[in-house]
Amino acid sequence: MYTTTLSVQGMTCTSCVASIQSMLEGVEGIEQFTISLLLERAIAVHDPSIISPDQIAEKIEDCGFDASVISSTEGEHGVMANYLLLSPMQAEQWTKVHNHINELQGVLSVNCSSSPDAAIRVIYDSEITGPRSIMKEILSMGVKCTFQPVDSSTSRILSLQRGSQIRVWKIRFIISISFSLAVMFLPQIFDSCDSMRAAFLVPHYFGICAGHIISLVLSLPVQFGVGRVYYSAAYHALKRGTANMDVLVSLGSTVAFAASIFFMILYSARHADNPAPIFFDTADMLLTFVTLGRYLESKAKGSTSAALSQLLSLAPSSATIIEDNEQIEILADLIERGDLILVKPGEIIPVDGTVVEGSSYVDESSVSGEPVPVHKTIDDELLSGTANGNGRLLVKATKSPRESQLAVIVDLVQRAQISHAPIQQFADRVAGIFVPVIVALSISTFTFWFLFTKYSSKYPSVFDDPMGKFAVCLKLTISVVVVACPCALGLSTPTAVMVGTGVGALNGIIIKGGEILERLNQVDTVVFDKTGTLTVGKLSVTDISIVDNLEELLDIPKNIFWAFVKASESSSEHPIGKAITEKASEFTDVSEIGIESFNAVPGEGVDVVLRWKERTFHALLGNSLLLEHNNVSIPDDFDSKLKLSSSSGLTCVRIAIDGQFVGFLGCMDQVRPDSYQTVSALKQLGKKVCLLTGDQKATARRVAQGLEIDFSDVYAEAVPSQKAEIIQKLKDQKHCVAMVGDGINDSPSLVLADVGIAPINGSGIALESADVILVRKGVLLDTAVSFDLSRVIVKRIKMNLVWACIYNFVMIPIAMGFFLPWGIYLNPMWASAAMMFSSLSVLASSLLLRRWKKPKSLIFSEADDVETESSTNSSVLQKVYTATRSIFGRNKSSNKYQPVANEV
């Protein structure tokens, strides 16, 4: 299967989206198709053997929209596509170039045309080759070649900011407002004095006023210049059997313009003495207000994608590589795996890689949320989009730019913004019947008032118009057509989803789509994996119990004893051994301990013979079995201590030297500093919190006790399949379940849960299975933040929909003349202004989500040994949302995690 991303231009409302969606969903070979009005992007998952990317673009164009393929990649990891522009050549040389490229290692397919200046599209495996290597091969054949990146960061930013679109609509508005104001005010100027009135407002030429001819001429640029956009879109919509906002606008404008010409001809044929009623100003101002609305909408839509633009701007456009001992500056898109990249002080790292030379402090706040610059040296990993400090680094690229963690984050955010929320189905259903209903209501309005004023003598005073009752009925009809606004309904959900998911991404929370947002808001039960999620995922020594007469018993100083412990476990790869080595290093700096023999006993511990000052020592570190097999007895007082520690969830390592028991070390996986606050916050949000782990019950209950999780909600000693069964059991009890985990063994549960949540430092499988990804490393509290954010976004969506419905329910009856008996009616010009306002108000409402701040209860209160963000952090995220700086302060809270007995 291929995943093809397309650019789709010309969509104006949800009716356009619905028509394309319905056209493509039934096409053979297309497995999945989603499209975004705001991003002007479509993503198709399809079988290329049945339908090609270009054929998908053609089908979209058949609907009346401009479409082009941005990228098309196979489902396999590392498979990429790019375009290369070649110089003109003969057909024979084209064949040679095609065949040569096709034979290159890593190239999967080549599509090219024999026409001059055509582009070849190369699909390749980025783990084997890249665009720069392919270009070198083409250049070696004497053919000039230019790289044309597919969907580069720069082009995507420009597209999202809608700069060209905003300029076009601005020009259209200036043209329309200039001519419309002239058409509106010239008749008033002509009527200002008798001589001008006689010259311009009295029929002279074939019964037509000169002023009317001038108004007609001035209206032409508006109707057939600016208005052509609406008429063309309306034509294509009707051609494909649908009706959208363009149809309503075109209908209202056409009726007013055509009626004006009709009356001019009619009065001319009758040689009438009075000037004909004309509505050129109505037609022109209608288009002017709509054009102003489109201009302001374009600017507002550009703001809705500000978060995605900021993420894209993190990656640099160029990079310096070292090739043949020379520094060469290239486009960042041309970087390939294995390239050596020179990163100078202050530069942005262009691609994920590892340090091969140099050291420096790197600011990772923009990508990982780590606020304090991290020291990087040889073999350390670097992330694209992070900022180098004062050092000079030589970096080996481990991924291509489009596979970097930053690119993955951007792709996830964009896919989330393209996806449709289930609540959007309501707007889609309404949009499907909206225009036909409005047209029917407008015809009914005209018919009713025309007949009413004709056969009744008691009609509202508004019909006593110099232009006649027919003209007033026509204006009411136009008002009904124009005031109705399906756009407000259509924009309610996608704008809120786009802004909301963008805000989430900037705060380190990636929500994979509108459907996930809704489910996240419905969750009532949150299940946590223990190891690596609620806990750090790294064992540490928390309990030390050593005999009082250690030095007399062994005839060695205490620091030498710790040196023995350190040396005994230094060769161990077991997590417990590493934890003991780290703890022992705190008590000794002695290193001249010799190891004569080392034996790791599976399931028991280590058996080591040590040498110090020409003396040998036999050391045993392990569980009770190791000591039993070596005939070492444990004193009764220590035996009771061991039982107490073991029952509280500690892993106890017994220590014996030369056959004598000297004590034990208790190890455990430390609870994360913000776990208590996370659990507490979730409970405040009304969520039930459960603990699910494969560890023993004592360990699980010990963690649950410290976090105040009910023992009845603790599920211990569960293998991956049992974890999934527990999730299903909770769902069967009518709970909406969220699973939070980071390991491979959590993947089945993450998939089965209604919402899967995983930290970005989790396993690759867990990240693929998760619906929500927490980008900020080590900040579990973002789990609770994601629930609060989803609640706010869904609430905003509902507010938008309610407002859009209220607007139409109120304004349409007013336009139809329901309140004419009380002198309340709606002029077509003001109807178009109201329609514009309704769409803009929904956009403004969604943009208010950018002001969202974390509740104070969800701001992490840190211990002194935990590094987090400070108020002076200068990341891009904070530059975008300066209002959220306060959330990163070091606020103290009484809800800090309190260790239970034996933890320290």
Curated annotation (Swiss-Prot):
Ranges of the Lumenal, vesicle topological domain: 194-197, 268-278, 453-469, 827-828
Name of the protein described by the UniProt record: Copper-transporting ATPase ccc2
Task of the protein: Probably involved in copper transport and in the regulation of cellular copper level. Retrieves copper from the metallochaperone atx1 and incorporates it into trans-Golgi vesicles.
Reaction(s) the record says it catalyses: Cu(+)(in) + ATP + H2O = Cu(+)(out) + ADP + phosphate + H(+)
Cited Pfam families: E1-E2_ATPase, HMA, Hydrolase
Biological source species: Schizosaccharomyces pombe (strain 972 / ATCC 24843)
Enzyme class: translocase
GO MF assignments: ATP binding; ATP hydrolysis activity; copper ion binding; P-type divalent copper transporter activity; P-type monovalent copper transporter activity
Name of the coding gene: ccc2
Keyword ATP-binding: yes
Keywords from the named record: ATP-binding, Copper, Copper transport, Golgi apparatus, Ion transport, Magnesium, Membrane, Metal-binding, Nucleotide-binding, Translocase, Transmembrane, Transmembrane helix, Transport
